[in-house]
C-alpha cells in the first residue's frame, strides 16, 4: 500500500508505542503478553483452580471478561448512575467451572472490580496496561467472528447477509483503540457509520450543540479509518465525500452500502492478529518463559509455536463433536474466520469445515444449561505449517484490487486465487447509477468488472515449516482453482446476540 510509511505497525498500535524498531516492538508486545499471563496465574490462585481447571477455556473467558468489565469506565459510571435491581455496580464475576467428584460443576463467583484492577495492575508493573485489555478484546472478537454469523445485523442496516466476510471485529467494543480499529472489517465500519447516520436522521439534535460537535468529530474519524482501509483512489474519493457531507443522510447510507459491496472484490486492508486466550499465556509464564526477554509478535511464528506446546481444555455438551470445537477455537486463535478454507486446511494440516457442517455451539455455556452430561476434552490447536498474517486484502498488483469471493478476507499471506461469484456480486450493482457519485461509481464498477476470479494473489508467498522460524523456505501450496472455500457459505450458524 502506498501510504504504508505513515501507518504504525500493528504491534505499535497494540502497545501504544511511538516508532520503535523490530526488537523494541517484539519486547513491548512480549511485555503485554507476559502481563496477561501473570494476571491469569494470580486469578487462578485466587479462585483456587487446579492446573486442569486453569487450562479450561471457559474459565479463561470468565476471568478475561471480569478484567474487561473492571476496566470499562463508561459502563461502570453508567451502572453507578442507573442502579438496576440485583446488580452491584462495584462487583464483577461469572461462572467458574470445577471438577467435583468426577463431575463438572458451575460456581458463580463475584469480586470487587477494585480488587480485579489491583491484581491486573500488579501483574503489569503497576500500569493500567490498556494494550493488554485490547488484546483480550480482540481475542473475544475473533472468537465471536468464528462462532456467529452477523446476518441479522447486516439485514437491519440494509446490507446483504452474504457480505459477512466484511464483518471482522463487529463485536469489538468502541473503546478498543487503534489496535481495534486496525482489525475491523470494511463492513463493520460501514455498519457503525450507517447506525450513526440513522440516529442523526431520527434525532434532530444528534449533530447539534456541544455533544453534536463531539459526534461529528467521531463521525469524521470513523470515515477516515474506513478510508484508510480502501486501496483504490475511487473508493477513497467516495469516502471523502461521505465524510465532508454537511448533513449525513440517505445519500451517504447508499454510498456506504455501495462501498461495502465493492469491497467484496476491491478488498480493503484489514489487519489480522493471533490473540490467544489468557489460559495459554498463563501456563507459559508459569513454566518460566519470559515473553518480554524472548520477544513476541502477533503476526509471525510465535503464536503458532505457543499453540504447538499448549494444553487447553474445553467443556463439551452431549451432542457436540470435540474435533469441531477444536476447529472453532483454532480459527479464532488464528483470526481465520474469513480466510479461505483451502488455505486454513493446508496450514492446519487437517480439513477445516464450513460452519454449517460443524456439530458444535459456541464455547461459552449459558447459566441455564444443565451441567450433568457435560464432559471436557482437549482442544487440538496445533498446526502443520505457519504463515505470516496479512493486512493487504490480497488484491493483485495489476489493478491493486482483484477477485474476492462473496466471502473471504484473507488472513494468511499465502499464494492462491480468490474465487468469487462475479455474477452474484455484480447483480447488486445494476440499477442505481444516478446520484452525485456516478463517475466514481462507474470507475469502481469498471474495476470490479475487470477483476478475474482465477487471478493469483500473494504471488510467490507460501507457508513455512514450524522449524523455519526465520521464514527462509516458503512452501507454495497449489490449490484446486475452481473450488471456493468460504466458511459461512450457505450456513446456519447462530446469530450473535449481545
From Swiss-Prot:
Subcellular location: Virion; Host nucleus
InterPro entries (alphabetical): Flu_NP
Residue window of motif Bipartite nuclear localization signal: 198-216
Entries under SUPFAM superfamilies matching the protein: flu NP-like
Post-translational modification comment from the UniProt entry: Late in virus-infected cells, may be cleaved from a 56-kDa protein to a 53-kDa protein by a cellular caspase. This cleavage might be a marker for the onset of apoptosis in infected cells or have a specific function in virus host interaction.
Keyword presence, Lipoprotein: no
Coiled-coil residues: none
Any single Gene Ontology cellular-component annotation: host cell
Compositionally biased tracts (Basic and acidic residues): 8-21
One family name in Pfam for this protein: Flu_NP
Placement of sequence motif Unconventional nuclear localization signal: 1-18
Molecular function as annotated in GO: RNA binding; structural molecule activity
SS bonds (residue pairs): none
Keywords of the record: Capsid protein, Helical capsid protein, Host nucleus, Host-virus interaction, Ribonucleoprotein, RNA-binding, Viral nucleoprotein, Viral penetration into host nucleus, Virion, Virus entry into host cell
A single GO BP: viral penetration into host nucleus
Region of interest (Disordered), residue spans: 1-21
Quaternary structure and interacting proteins, as annotated: Homomultimerizes to form the nucleocapsid. May bind host exportin-1/XPO1. Binds to viral genomic RNA. Protein-RNA contacts are mediated by a combination of electrostatic interactions between positively charged residues and the phosphate backbone and planar interactions between aromatic side chains and bases.
Known function: Encapsidates the negative strand viral RNA, protecting it from nucleases. The encapsidated genomic RNA is termed the ribonucleoprotein (RNP) and serves as template for transcription and replication. The RNP needs to be localized in the host nucleus to start an infectious cycle, but is too large to diffuse through the nuclear pore complex. NP comprises at least 2 nuclear localization signals that are responsible for the active RNP import into the nucleus through cellular importin alpha/beta pathway.
Similarity-based family: Belongs to the influenza viruses nucleoprotein family.
Protein's recorded name: Nucleoprotein
Organism name: Influenza A virus (strain A/China:Nanchang/11/1996 H1N1)
Amino acid at each position: 500500500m502506498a501510504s504504508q510509511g505513515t501507518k504504525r505497525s500493528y504491534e505499535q498500535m497494540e502497545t501504544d508505542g511511538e516508532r520503535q524498531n523490530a526488537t523494541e516492538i517484539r519486547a513491548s508486545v512480549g511485555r503485554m503478553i507476559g502481563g496477561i499471563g501473570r494476571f491469569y496465574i494470580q486469578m487462578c490462585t485466587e479462585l483456587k483452580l487446579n492446573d486442569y481447571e486453569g487450562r479450561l477455556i471457559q474459565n479463561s473467558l470468565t476471568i478475561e471478561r471480569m478484567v474487561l468489565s473492571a476496566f470499562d469506565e463508561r459502563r461502570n459510571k453508567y451502572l453507578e448512575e442507573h442502579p438496576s435491581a440485583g446488580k452491584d455496580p462495584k462487583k464483577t464475576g461469572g461462572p467458574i467451572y470445577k471438577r467435583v467428584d468426577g463431575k463438572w460443576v458451575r460456581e458463580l463467583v463475584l469480586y470487587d472490580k477494585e480488587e480485579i484492577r489491583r491484581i491486573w495492575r500488579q501483574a503489569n508493573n503497576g500500569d493500567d496496561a490498556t494494550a493488554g485489555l485490547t488484546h483480550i478484546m480482540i481475542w473475544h472478537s475473533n472468537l465471536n467472528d468464528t462462532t456467529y454469523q452477523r446476518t441479522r445485523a447486516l439485514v437491519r442496516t440494509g446490507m446483504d447477509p452474504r457480505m459477512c466476510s466484511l464483518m471482522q471485529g463487529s463485536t469489538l467494543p468502541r473503546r478498543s483503540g487503534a489496535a481495534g480499529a486496525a482489525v475491523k472489517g470494511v463492513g463493520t465500519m460501514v455498519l457503525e457509520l450507517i447506525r450513526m447516520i440513522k440516529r442523526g436522521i431520527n434525532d434532530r439534535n444528534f449533530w447539534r450543540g456541544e455533544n453534536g460537535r463531539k459526534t461529528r468529530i467521531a463521525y469524521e474519524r470513523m470515515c477516515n479509518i474506513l478510508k484508510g482501509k480502501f486501496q483504490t483512489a475511487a473508493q477513497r474519493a467516495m469516502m471523502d465525500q461521505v465524510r465532508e457531507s454537511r448533513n449525513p443522510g440517505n445519500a451517504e447510507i447508499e454510498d456506504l452500502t455501495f462501498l461495502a459491496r465493492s469491497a467484496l472484490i476491491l478488498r480493503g486492508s484489514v489487519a489480522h492478529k493471533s490473540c490467544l486466550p489468557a489460559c495459554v499465556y498463563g501456563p507459559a509464564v508459569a513454566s518460566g518463559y519470559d515473553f518480554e526477554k524472548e520477544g513476541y509478535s502477533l503476526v509471525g511464528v510465535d503464536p503458532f509455536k505457543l499453540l504447538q506446546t499448549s494444553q487447553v481444555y474445553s467443556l463439551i455438551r452431549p451432542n457436540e463433536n470435540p474435533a469441531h470445537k477444536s476447529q472453532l477455537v483454532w480459527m479464532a486463535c488464528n483470526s481465520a474466520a474469513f480466510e479461505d478454507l483451502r488455505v486454513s486446511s493446508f496450514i492446519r494440516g487437517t480439513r477445516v469445515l464450513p460452519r454449517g457442517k460443524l456439530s458444535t455451539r459456541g464455547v461459552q455455556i449459558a447459566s441455564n444449561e444443565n451441567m450433568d452430561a457435560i464432559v471436557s476434552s482437549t482442544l487440538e490447536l496445533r498446526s502443520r505449517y505457519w504463515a505470516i498474517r496479512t493486512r493487504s486484502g490480497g488484491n493483485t498488483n495489476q489493478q491493486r484490487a482483484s477477485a474476492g469471493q462473496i466471502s473471504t478476507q484473507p488472513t494468511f499471506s499465502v499464494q492462491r486465487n480468490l474465487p468469487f461469484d462475479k455474477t452474484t456480486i455484480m447483480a447488486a450493482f445494476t440499477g442505481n447509477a444516478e446520484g452525485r457519485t456516478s463517475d466514481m461509481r462507474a470507475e469502481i464498477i469498471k474495476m470490479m468488472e475487470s477483476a478475474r476470479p482465477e487471478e493469483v494473489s500473494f504471488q510467490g508467498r507460501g507457508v513455512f515449516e514450524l522449524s523455519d522460524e526465520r521464514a527462509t523456505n516458503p512452501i507454495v501450496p497449489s490449490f484446486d482453482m475452481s473450488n471456493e472455500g468460504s466458511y459461512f457459505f450457505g450456513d446456519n450458524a447462530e446469530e450473535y446476540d449481545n
